[in-house]
Structure formats: C-alpha cells, structure tokens
Design a protein with these regions (language model features):
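Mixed-charge, glycine-accented linear interaction segment located at domain edges/termini
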Residues: 109-174
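Terminal domain-start segments
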Residues: 1-47, 149-170, 182
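A contiguous binding-surface segment within folded domains or other stable secondary-structure elements
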Residues: 37, 41-87
Length: 182
C-alpha cells in the first residue's frame, strides 16, 4: 500500500460543472491519457494497493462538495465506487492516513474520521443498508471496499464549528432540571 505521486497517477479535467452535469476528468497514468473518464473535478489522492488503484475525487462545488472514491483494477476497469456527502453539506478532504494492510483513514465531512477498508475479495452488501449515513453507491449486491464512519449531525448556521463539543455539553435547562431533582 502506497500513495501514488502525481507523475504516476493524475487526472485532467475534461468538462467543468454545469447546471445539469458534474465535472468529469480523464485518468492519466505515467503522464499518459488512458481514455478512462470519471465524475469529479479534483483528484485529491491516489493509492496503490494489491494491483488496484484507489482514487479520491472532489466535485469542486462550493457548499455542496462530494467526495467520490473509485477502485480500479490493474487495467483501470472500475471495480467499485462510492460517494460521500449530501445536499447542502460540504467537506474538505484532509488527513489521509494509510493503515496497512488494507485501510485508508481520512476526514471529509460531519466531523468524522472515515475509513475505507479495502477488500481482497468482493463481499455481499445490501444496497441502501450496508453503508453509513452520507454514503451512496449505485445499486449492486457486492462491493470491493467498505466505508466506515459515524457522521455527526450538521451544526446549525452560526453555531460552533465543533458539533462534537455541542453534542456533549448539556443544555442549561437540563442542568437546572437535574439540580432541582436533587
């Protein structure tokens, strides 16, 4: 498992976001076009794992950015894909950590450390039920990587940026009720 450099694996923007279509990018291997085009505007990172390449793309849409994770085989055939995000929410792809032998940890949205667990063999998965909230995939019964994470509720506009801190602090009325019962 290793992070790929931009000279080994990159992307070239083919079309920009429009009102009706997402941006798309062509994959480049060793600086050469492959003809493989995926949804996504910015290649955030790429990882090599057991003759597979895992690519992380964002859409570059302010206030509604999605993270697209693609897994390709050695011939760049798409094995699996997932999208993290939701309407009216945004994220920033940060803190990618390779955790051998088969896990990629990162942050994107909802104050969560997400994990992509790469699978040597495909596994059965129930569509719409097997992934955490905020993760979507095309309808199919098998996957080649699992997404794990427990997204926190989105904070309200003007509220503290730390949803975790807000979630753990009792409200004044709850504290008042507890002291009255004693």
């Amino acid at each position: 498992m290793r992070l790929l450099s931009n000279s080994e694996f990159a992307a070239r923007l083919v079309s920009h976001n429009t009102d009706t279509a997402l941006a798309s990018s062509e994959l480049l291997v060793d600086g050469k076009p492959t003809g493989v085009v995926v949804d996504g505007a910015i290649l955030e990172a790429a990882v090599d794992w057991q003759d597979c390449r895992i690519a992380f793309f964002t859409d570059d849409i302010p206030f509604e950015d999605m993270l697209r994770i693609y897994m390709f085989d050695a011939n760049l055939a798409l094995l699996d894909a997932a999208v993290l995000g939701g309407m009216y929410s945004t994220g920033a792809f940060t803190d990618l950590h390779l955790q051998p032998p088969n896990t990629l940890a990162f942050r994107f949205f909802a104050g969560t450390v997400w994990r992509a667990v790469l699978l040597a063999e495909r596994e059965f998965a129930l569509p719409f039920l097997s992934d955490p909230r905020g993760v979507s995939r095309t309808f199919k019964f098998f996957r080649h990587f699992r997404i794990e994470g427990e997204p926190l509720p989105e904070s309200l506009p003007g509220a503290s940026d730390s949803a975790e801190t807000a979630r753990r602090q009792p409200t004044a009325s709850a504290s008042h009720r507890a002291s009255r019962k004693s």
